């Protein structure tokens, strides 16, 4: 282990479980979710918690160096009523508590839905304005704005990861060129998260979370330069799906 104490929210989700299983010998984890893990947490700590209850956060963050915040409603069709407690309030409370606890960095799971309003044939480059196509994307834009605010006004380092279409190769829902161009493979997701936790000298970054796909919905040049991210997988080679738009 490298000595870092990491709070992983949404630990029972697909990305959370994948990251934990690949990194459990690398970090000391406090895992949290409203669900019960279906995997062995071993020597690590698991705490049932609803992050929209701010009274739970101080105890969760005691001794934590880095937060990897994956929890929240992940559905593009989610309503505002569902998003408000889970994606807006819980995220706000977590940032507030992180600063109060002296956490060094918060890695926020944003989404490619923040830019889904752009035409599918337009690559998203760093600095382009957000253009969400649904309220879920709006909630992730809010999280990105929190990252910028807290990085500017407090000692907290923040990295927002615009995660694309995370899918396992055996069971996936990639159906067209748009999906393939945004694919993030499990092993590339692990690498991206580890590099985000470990990176030195980064105060604030909005990074792009996709694999090394032949056609890329999101440009990876800045993410590669700042984090040293070197994705290994290509959806077009891996899945060989006939390309439709």
Language model features with spans:
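Conserved C-terminal active-site "lid" loop/helix of NAD(P)H-dependent oxidoreductases
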Residues: 205-207, 212-230, 245
């Amino acid at each position: 282990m490298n000595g870092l104490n990491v709070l992983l929210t949404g630990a029972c989700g697909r990305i959370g479980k994948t990251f934990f299983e690949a990194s459990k010998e690398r970090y000391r984890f406090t895992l949290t979710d409203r669900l019960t893990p279906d995997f062995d947490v071993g020597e690590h700590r698991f705490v049932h918690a609803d992050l929209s209850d701010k009274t739970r956060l101080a105890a969760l963050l005691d001794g934590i160096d880095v937060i990897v915040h994956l929890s929240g409603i992940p559905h593009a069709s989610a309503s505002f009523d569902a998003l408000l407690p889970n994606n807006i309030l819980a995220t706000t409370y977590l940032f507030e508590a992180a600063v109060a606890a002296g956490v060094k960095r918060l890695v926020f799971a944003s989404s490619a839905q923040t830019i889904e309003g752009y035409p599918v044939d337009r690559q998203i480059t760093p600095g382009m304005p957000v253009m969400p196509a649904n309220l879920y994307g709006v909630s992730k834009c809010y999280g990105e704005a929190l990252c910028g605010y807290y990085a500017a006004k407090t000692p907290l380092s923040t990295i927002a990861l615009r995660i694309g279409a995370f899918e396992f190769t055996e069971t996936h829902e990639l159906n067209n060129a748009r999906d393939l161009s945004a694919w993030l493979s499990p092993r590339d997701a692990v690498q991206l998260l580890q590099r985000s936790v470990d990176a030195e000298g980064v105060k604030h970054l909005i990074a792009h979370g996709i694999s090394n796909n032949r056609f890329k919905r999101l440009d990876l040049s800045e993410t590669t330069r700042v984090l040293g991210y070197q994705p290994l997988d290509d959806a077009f080679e891996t899945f060989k799906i006939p390309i439709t738009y």
